[in-house]
Amino acid sequence: MHTGVKTAVQQYIDGCAAADSRRVADAFDAGAVMWGYLGDEYVTMTGAEFATQVVGTATPAGPEYRSEIQRIEVTGKVASAVLVEEGFLGSNFRNELGLVERDGRWRIVSKVFTTL
C-alpha cells in the first residue's frame, strides 16, 4: 500500500472522527469536488465546503465510528482508494476517493460516495 496515499486517506479519517474541519480540509486539494447520495438525495459540494459545513458542525465520533481502507491503487502520480465508514454522523458510507500527488504531497481531488 502506498504510504503517501494511505497518509492522506488516514488524515481524512482522523479529521472526520475528531470533527476537525482543518485536518479534513488539508486532506483535500484546493479544487476538490465531491458527489454522491445521502439516501435518495443527490449531494455535491467542494472538499472545503464538506470540511466546514459537515465536519465543522459535527461532534467528534463515538466508539460506533469505524473505518476501513479497502483498496488503494496507484499509477504514477494518481491514485484511487475505497474507504468504508460505519457510524459517521449516524450513517454508513462507501467513499471512492481520487488522489493526486503534487508538490510531493498526496491530496484528495475527488470523492464519490453513497450511504449503505
Regions found by a protein language model. Give the residues of each.
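Short, low-complexity N-terminal intrinsically disordered segments enriched in polar/charged residues
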Residues: 1-22, 26-30, 48
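Surface-exposed, charged secondary-structure patches
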Residues: 4, 13, 33-38, 43-92
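Residue-level detector of alpha-helical recognition elements and their boundaries
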Residues: 20, 27, 38-40, 47, ...
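Short secondary-structure boundary/capping segments
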Residues: 24, 70-71, 98
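Short beta-strand segments enriched in hydrophobic/aromatic residues
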Residues: 28-29, 85-87, 112-113
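Residue-level recognition of short loop/turn positions
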Residues: 31, 75, 103-105
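Feature marks short, surface-exposed loop/turn motifs that line or immediately flank catalytic pockets
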Residues: 31-32, 116
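Short beta-strand edge/turn micro-motifs at domain boundaries
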Residues: 94-116
